């Protein structure tokens, strides 16, 4: 059973019933829906299409909504694009004008207040670099350092600047509320800068009665500097290497990636590693050697999940990308000593009862050479605590709640199974063991460890461990 989870972005290349089925067969655990593009009507069509496929397949694929986030973009140009030349003067303005080769309008009205002479402004993922010469009212006077073509609506980054723009735009608020109504399992919050940003989204979710979990996307130095607080407030983080690689020097990205994965593991939180993992498979049926090594290294570091973006959204080989990623993950995991890794989980707080029992369960499973840990959970809390320990064997998490089952599909090493409601706890436990037999790793005569909270249904009430020989 593969432990590392695979997230696939749904787009034109994958948004049809045939390909969605192929992605599930190939190993997709989570489907990502990018709200930077498209309308609510289009998003609902995609959501409903995958939901129908998953219903027929009884596949507990988790649904992840990725917000647009607080971003700065250029407005329109005369003719749609211009050519900038190294050394020329170029002005950014907050006035709503039609841009040309000398002057362009930006969407963020307070940018002149947030930048100063000597700073840098990057356009189009850093392909265009401007040096800020001076700021005068609504005008930011610049010199082009790296030139090239610039077209409508390209993104603007300001490395090192602490932008004062609000974290949740009206568009994001509308998107999140819409996502709550549809029933997304996770919200990926773009450009998260602080714990307060996470809490602002949590407030919207609570008001809508949503139990969606929050994955904070770390994409700038503000997020890096506030990483510990963000992890405490969020359910996990995403190492969003695209914008992060624009905001910080490229040589810092691998160092920061390892730091983020390590800190998330220490706090028992989800960590997703994303961006250009198999980028060459947008056009080619095989990845580069560097890409396969990149995927493996993220798994060696301890990432919870690895994500495909354009590869499955608009690439020529979406199914092959997932299969390739799954093969790399399985081979890498076979090389990892999880017993040593479990004992090396550093500084994790196990003072609450569920964490202590979960740790004990994992130790027992190692001692008796269990084929699997089986948990019966109503809230998913026990599964999260078990996953955080990185046990030697897989975790089969049984629940009658389909939404909780989907959420657990983003937990490291957790394999969710939907079981029917039962009249008693013992009936649920028996149903869970029967469900575990459907996995190739669990056969009659094998030893498994069962853990749950009695009575069932109380989050954080894990208090029971049993060692069972499968009949």
Language model segments and positions:
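Non-catalytic helical/linker scaffolds that mediate oligomerization, partner binding
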Residues: 1-471
């Amino acid at each position: 059973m593969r432990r590392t989870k695979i997230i696939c972005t749904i787009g034109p290349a994958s948004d049809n019933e045939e390909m969605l089925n192929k992605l599930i067969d190939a190993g997709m655990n989570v489907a990502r829906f990018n709200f930077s593009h498209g309308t609510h009507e289009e998003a609902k069509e995609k959501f409903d299409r995958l939901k129908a496929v998953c219903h027929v397949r009884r596949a507990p694929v988790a649904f992840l909504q990725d917000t647009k986030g607080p971003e700065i973009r250029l407005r329109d140009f005369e003719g749609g694009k211009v050519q900038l030349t190294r050394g020329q003067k170029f002005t950014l303005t907050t006035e709503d004008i039609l841009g040309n080769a000398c002057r362009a309008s930006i969407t963020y009205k307070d940018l002149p207040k947030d930048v100063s002479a000597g700073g840098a402004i990057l356009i189009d993922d850093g392909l265009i670099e401007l040096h800020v010469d001076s700021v005068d009212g609504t005008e930011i006077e610049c010199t082009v350092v790296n030139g090239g073509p610039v077209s409508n609506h390209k993104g603007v980054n300001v490395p090192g600047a602490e932008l004062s723009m609000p974290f949740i735009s009206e568009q994001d608020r509308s998107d999140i509320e819409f996502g709550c109504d549809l029933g997304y399992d996770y919200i990926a919050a773009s450009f998260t800068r602080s714990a307060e940003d996470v809490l602002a989204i949590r407030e919207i979710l609570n008001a809508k009665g949503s139990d969606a979990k929050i994955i904070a996307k770390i994409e700038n130095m503000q997020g890096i500097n506030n990483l510990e607080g963000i992890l405490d407030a969020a359910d996990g983080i995403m190492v969003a290497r695209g914008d992060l690689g624009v905001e910080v020097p490229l040589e810092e990205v691998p160092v920061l990636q390892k730091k983020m994965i390590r800190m998330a593991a220490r706090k028992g939180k989800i960590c997703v590693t994303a961006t250009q993992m198999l980028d060459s498979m947008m056009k080619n049926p095989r990845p580069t050697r560097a890409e396969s090594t990149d995927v493996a290294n993220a798994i060696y570091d301890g990432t919870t999940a690895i994500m495909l973006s354009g590869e499955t959204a608009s690439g020529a080989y979406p199914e092959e990308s997932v299969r390739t990623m799954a093969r790399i993950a399985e081979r890498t995991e076979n090389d990892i000593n999880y017993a040593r890794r479990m004992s090396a989980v550093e500084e994790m707080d196990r003072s609450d009862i569920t964490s202590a029992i979960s740790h004990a369960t994992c130790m027992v499973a190692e001692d008796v050479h269990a084929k699997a840990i089986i948990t019966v959970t109503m809230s998913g809390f026990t599964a999260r605590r078990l996953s955080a320990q990185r046990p030697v064997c897989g975790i089969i998490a049984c629940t009658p709640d389909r939404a909780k089952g989907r959420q657990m599909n983003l937990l490291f090493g957790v394999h969710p199974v939907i079981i029917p409601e039962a009249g008693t706890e013992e009936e649920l436990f028996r149903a869970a063991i029967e469900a575990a037999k459907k996995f190739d790793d669990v056969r009659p005569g094998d030893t498994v460890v069962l853990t749950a909270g009695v009575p069932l249904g109380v989050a954080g009430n894990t208090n029971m461990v049993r060692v069972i020989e499968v009949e």
